[in-house]
C-alpha cells in the first residue's frame, strides 16, 4: 500500500509540474523567454523596490540586500491592497451583465467540481470494501452508508469514474467560461496603460527605455490573469478543501489524523513562505537582466544602419550576450532554489502521508479499520496534495504577479508635468482670434545647469510668417516645443491671441497647431495612412490633394503599390526627402491655424524646396507660421526673421534690414553663400 502512496505522490508532483508548464506556454504567446525559465511559478515576493538609476524613472526591477523599514512595509501593504481592490473591480463589472453572469457560472462550476471531487475517495473506499468482503452482511456492517445496501463493485467503480470525469469537466468548463473575464480585463488595462503613456509629457518619453517599458507592460498584463485566477479559483477553494478534508478525517478516523493533516499543512505553508522570501532577490535580478537585455536588443535593432556603418555587429552581439549571461546566472539561482523548495514541499507531504498510512495499517491489524479506510485516507491526503501543491505555486505566482502589477501601477501613477490644471472649474478652450503668438521674458532649461532660453521676448502677429535662425543649440526647436506645450516655461509666459497657453485646455491648443518636425518618424504602415493621420476624418481626395501640395503625389504614383506602399519601420523604406514631404502633406491635411515647421525643407533639393515654398506661401495665407530655418533662402521669404544665440534673441527684422545691420544674420548669410560658391 505504501508503494501505492508513493505512486499517488509521484502523480501529484507530475501533475503539478505539467500544470506549471501549461501556464508557462500559455504566457509565452505574450512574450518570449529564455528556455532556462521554467514557469511563472519561479517567483518573487512583493517588495517595494528602491529608486533605480534607470531612465525609466526606476520603473524596472532590481535586486537589493537591504531590509525594509516599517514605513516601507506599510507602503508595500497599501500597494498590494490597492492592486487587489483594482483587480477585484474587474471581477464584477457593473456595466457588463454578461461578464457578471460568467463569474457566477464559473463559481457554480467550481462548486460542482469540488462536490464531485469529494465523492471520489468515498466511492473508492466503498469499492475496495465491497471487493474485500465475502457476504452482503459483512459489506453492510463494514460500510454504514446507504449506498452500501444496494451497491455492487461494478456500479460503484462506474460512479467513481463518473465523479472523476464530472469533476474534470466542471473544471474545464469553468476555465472556458471565465477566460473571457480575464481576457477582457487584460484588454481594458492594456488600453488604459497605452492611453496613460500618451498622456505623459515629452520629458518622460525622452528619458524612458523602450525595451524595459515594454517588459513592464507585458509582465503586468500577464499578471492580471494570474491574480484573477488565483483570487477566484485557487485561494478560497483551497482553504475550503483543506478544511473539508481535515473535518472528514477528524469525523471518520479521529483527531490524530486531523492533527497530522493540520501540522503538515501548517509546515508546508510556513516552509513555502520562508523559502520563497529568500528567493525574492533572484527573481528581481532576473527581471532586471531581462529588462536590460530587451532594451539592448531593441536599441541595437532600431540603430541597425549605424551598426552596419561601423561594422559593429560582433560588438552588439557581445554586449547582448553579456546581458543574457546575467539573466542566465540569475535564472540558474532561481532554478536551484526552486528545486530546494519543491524537494522540501514533497518531503513534508511524504512524511504526513507515510505517518497516516502507518496509523491506518495498525488500525487494520487491530480490526478497527478496513482496507477501504486506508484507501480513503490515502485518497483524501492525495486529494489534499493537489491544492497544497497549487497553493504553493499559486502563492508564488500571485506574489510575482503583485510584483509585476506594482511596477505597472507605478507606471500608471506617473503624472505629467504638462496638462490641464487640477482645478474645481474646467479650463476654457483656446479662443482663436487670428493666431498671434507672443513670448514674454521666457526662461527655460532642461537641466538646472544648462540654460536653453534666457529671457526671450518676441511677438508673431496673426497671419504673419516668422523665421527663427541661429547656430545649433541656441534654443530654436525648444521655442516650437514651448508653443505646443511639450514643455512649460520656468518663468515668463507664452500667449496665443493674448491667452496664456497654460490657462486653456491642451486639446484645444494642440488642435489648432500643425507641426512638421525636424526628425520625421513615420508609422510602420502605408503612405496613405501616414498622410491621412493628419486628419482621420479627411476623404481620399483630400489626402491626394495634400500630397500634391507637398510635391509627393507624383512620386507616390510611381511606386508599384502607390498609396498602399508600406514605409517600413520608422519610414526607413523612404528617402529623407520623401519622408519629409509625407510629413508636410500630413500637416497640410490638418490645415491648422498655426503652422510650426522645424527645418521642414532641410532634406529637400533646391528645386523641390522652391516648389514647396510656393505651397507654403499659399498655405501661410491668413495663417500664423513659424519656421526654424537652417537654409537662409527659406528664412528670407518670411515676413520677419528672428536671430538667436545662446538662448537669447540678438536680432529681429526682415531679410534686407538684417543684411544692412551687418550683424549676426549678415555673417550667417555670407557664410552660406561662400559655402555654396565653393
Curated annotation (Swiss-Prot):
The residues that hold ATP are 446, 470-481
Q: Which residues cross the membrane?
A: 104-124, 143-163, 230-250, 255-275, 338-358, 374-394
* PANTHER family on file: ABC TRANSPORTER B FAMILY MEMBER 23, MITOCHONDRIAL-RELATED, ATP-BINDING CASSETTE SUB-FAMILY B
Q: Give the membrane topology, semicolon-separated if more than one.
A: Multi-pass membrane protein
What does it do?
Performs an essential function in the generation of cytoplasmic iron-sulfur proteins by mediating export of Fe/S cluster precursors synthesized by NFS1 and other mitochondrial proteins. Not involved in the export of cyclic pyranopterin monophosphate (cPMP) from mitochondria into the cytosol.
Location in the cell: Mitochondrion inner membrane
Question: What organism, scientifically named, is this protein from?
Answer: Arabidopsis thaliana
Task: State the deletion phenotype.
Answer: No visible phenotype.
* Recorded GO CC terms: mitochondrial inner membrane; mitochondrion
Q: Which residues form the ABC transporter domain?
A: 437-671
State what protein this is by name: ABC transporter B family member 23, mitochondrial
The entry's family comment says: Belongs to the ABC transporter superfamily. ABCB family. Heavy Metal importer (TC 3.A.1.210) subfamily.
- The yes or no answer to whether the keyword Ion transport is present is yes
The record lists the lineage as: Eukaryota, Viridiplantae, Streptophyta, Embryophyta, Tracheophyta
The source's superkingdom equals: Eukaryota
Q: Give the SMART domains listed for this entry.
A: AAA
Q: Which UniProt keywords apply?
A: ATP-binding, Ion transport, Iron, Iron transport, Membrane, Mitochondrion, Mitochondrion inner membrane, Nucleotide-binding, Transit peptide, Transmembrane, Transmembrane helix, Transport
- Expression across tissues: Expressed in roots, leaves, stems, flowers and siliques.
What's the encoding gene here?
ABCB23
Tell me the residues of the organelle transit peptide: 1-63
Q: Which residues form the ABC transmembrane type-1 domain?
A: 103-400
MF terms (GO), sorted A to Z: ABC-type transporter activity; ATP binding; ATP hydrolysis activity
Q: Which Gene3D superfamilies match?
A: ABC transporter type 1, transmembrane domain, P-loop containing nucleotide triphosphate hydrolases
One Gene Ontology BP term is:
response to cadmium ion
Q: How does it assemble?
A: Homodimer.
Looking up InterPro entries in the UniProt record yields: AAA+_ATPase (IPR003593), ABC1_TM_dom (IPR011527), ABC1_TM_sf (IPR036640), ABC_transporter-like_ATP-bd (IPR003439), ABC_transporter-like_CS (IPR017871), P-loop_NTPase (IPR027417), Type_1_exporter (IPR039421)
UniProt cross-references to SUPFAM superfamilies, sorted A to Z: ABC transporter transmembrane region (SSF90123), P-loop containing nucleoside triphosphate hydrolases (SSF52540)
